[in-house]
A protein has these predicted regions:
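Short glycine/acidic-enriched loop and turn motifs that connect beta-strands
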Residues: 71-75, 124-127, 175-180, 261-265, ...
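Beta-propeller blade termini
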Residues: 49-67, 103-118, 153-170, 240-249, ...
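Blade-edge motifs of beta-propeller repeat domains
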Residues: 24-49, 81-103, 132-151, 191-201, ...
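Exposed, low-structure sequence patches enriched in small/polar residues
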Residues: 316-317, 364, 370-371, 375-377, ...
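Short, conserved, GDST-rich strand-edge loop motifs in beta-rich repeat architectures
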Residues: 171-207, 267
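Bacterial Sec-dependent N-terminal signal peptides
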Residues: 1-26
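Post-signal peptide N-terminal segment of secreted/secretory-pathway proteins
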Residues: 54-57, 63-134
Length: 474
């Protein structure tokens, strides 16, 4: 019992603190490593959220390397060196290296034909220009400009160098807004009312849109400003997170894919040298023509070139793992680009990644006499990690998402499921407790989640092959 309790508490403390980005004492907390073949597992940082900022051929490999910022209690910028791809084309990266930079968020990273890696950072109404120094592993400031007067402070930025060496900056601005119905409310107060009598959200709502500034050269010369290049000021609810320049059609087009807080990806295009309004908003879809939605909230996005085709795939981060979306080379008849379903981006020597805000339950799940881990997370999934070691020396491999009634368990708040209101719609906050509730010798799951409800998942399988039934509310 003492061993189990100590092991369980160690997991609780490690998972709770490491994924909040709280500084750790290496002597106190040792991350559990993935025991998957070659130690390969989902790319992850000890932070609450992953913000992908760009890719570039830093180490002259066959595929680009990746820049990611980790945010939470602390914010740091990291560089991942590309090592190889899986058979399905998913990139595998080396362990992350921390990068020094005067700024770490609200930026875009791109590479020019001279192989220099640039980063442009937003600082209120200015853009700061830095260049990557490989030897120093840092972005060094080389200049900056004050932006022309815009309708709002920019929220994110992307840069495109055109064939005539002019440079287009695309900036995300705050557009249409709806104030809160009730003033001076705090979610911690007894007066808090996230929904009115009709069940309609009372929380504030805002949308963002794109503007365009063209410079004759990179941040130099007299700019040409187009205050709005989208068809409305109501393009993306609660923000785009960031903007990626992509190449899908390969016919002298400017193409953009934007992330979003809710996890959808929007697509825009126009002829390269025009400064016309972008095409109407389209969405990234799957092969079934259904919109792709990132597995977690706050999806940031960057382009990731396919060196064989010359087109770009995308990599997206958020509050959870970082995912790879492969471009199919096709558009739907009505103009939506088709991408694959997301696959986790991988790294070597990976820590055991359970998602953000994991809640573990230690149990012998598969009846082999060795204690495994069942984990719920903020994405709204439940994961199974099998112990291939023993209880004195546990070694875990990820075995995927736990299912109920033949489907992955996936719970999120939706429009009205959170006491904090609709901004929490993409969170699940699953808290599984594994226990033999029915007394038949099989482990069942009692689940708490963001909705405040508790549900029971009865195990109708066998001791060695658990099979959960559909959930039953308490």
């Amino acid at each position: 019992f003492i061993l189990r309790k100590t092991f369980f508490l160690s997991i609780i403390f490690f998972l709770s603190f490491s994924f909040l980005g709280i500084a750790q004492n290496d002597q106190d907390l040792i991350p559990l490593k993935s025991m998957a073949p070659d130690g390969i597992g989902p790319l992850s940082l000890p932070h609450l959220r992953h913000m992908v900022l760009g890719s570039a051929f830093v180490y002259n490999g066959d595929c680009p390397d990746l820049f990611i910022a980790g945010t939470g209690k602390t914010t740091e910028l990291y560089l991942y060196k590309w090592l190889r791809n899986t058979e399905n084309g998913v990139p595998i990266f080396d362990k992350p290296h921390k990068i020094a930079s005067p700024f770490k968020l609200k930026g875009t990273i791109f590479q020019t034909d001279d192989h220099n890696v640039h980063a442009l950072w937003l600082k209120k109404d200015s853009v700061i220009h830095t260049v990557f120094n490989l030897k120093k592993q840092s972005f060094d400031r080389i200049g900056g400009i004050e932006l022309p007067e815009l309708a709002s402070l920019p929220q994110s930025i992307a840069a495109r160098i055109n064939k005539d060496q002019s440079v287009d900056l695309f900036l995300e601005l705050v557009g249409h807004s709806i104030p809160a119905k009730y003033a001076n409310q705090n979610p911690s107060s007894k007066e808090w009312r996230p929904y009115d009598e009709a069940g309609v959200s009372t929380t504030p709502l805002h949308y963002t849109y794109l503007c365009n500034i063209r410079y004759p050269r990179l941040l130099s010369g007299t700019p040409s400003v187009k205050q709005m290049v989208t068809h409305s000021r109501k393009e993306t609810r609660w923000g785009m997170m960031n903007i990626a320049m992509v190449t899908l059609r390969k016919n002298d087009m400017q193409e953009l894919i934007c992330g979003s807080r809710l996890g959808n990806f929007t697509y825009y295009s126009r002829p390269e040298l025009s400064q016309d309004t972008l095409s109407p908003r389209h969405y990234v879809v799957g092969s079934d023509n259904i919109l792709l939605q990132h597995p977690s909230i706050s999806a940031s996005v960057c382009s990731y070139v396919d060196v064989k085709s010359g087109t770009t795939n995308i990599i997206a981060g958020g509050e959870g793992a970082v995912y790879f979306y492969k471009y199919s080379g096709e558009f739907t008849l009505d103009g939506h680009p088709v991408f694959s379903q997301p696959s986790p981006v991988l790294q070597v020597d990976a820590d055991l990644y359970c998602g953000t805000l994991p809640v573990p339950s230690v149990i012998d799940w598969d009846g082999d006499g060795i204690e495994d881990i069942i984990v719920g997370n903020s994405d709204g999934h439940v994961l199974f990690f099998k112990n291939i070691g023993n209880n004195n020396n546990p070694r875990f491999i990820p075995k995927g998402r736990v299912q109920a009634d033949g489907k992955d368990i996936h719970i999120q708040a939706g429009y009205s499921g959170s006491v904090q209101g609709t901004p929490e719609s993409r969170w699940g906050y699953l808290s599984p407790t594994v226990v033999d509730w029915t007394g038949d010798g099989l482990p069942d799951i009692i689940m708490g989640d963001i909705t405040g409800k508790y549900t029971l998942y009865v195990n109708k399988g066998t001791r060695t092959e658990p099979k959960l039934d559909a959930p039953q509310p308490f």
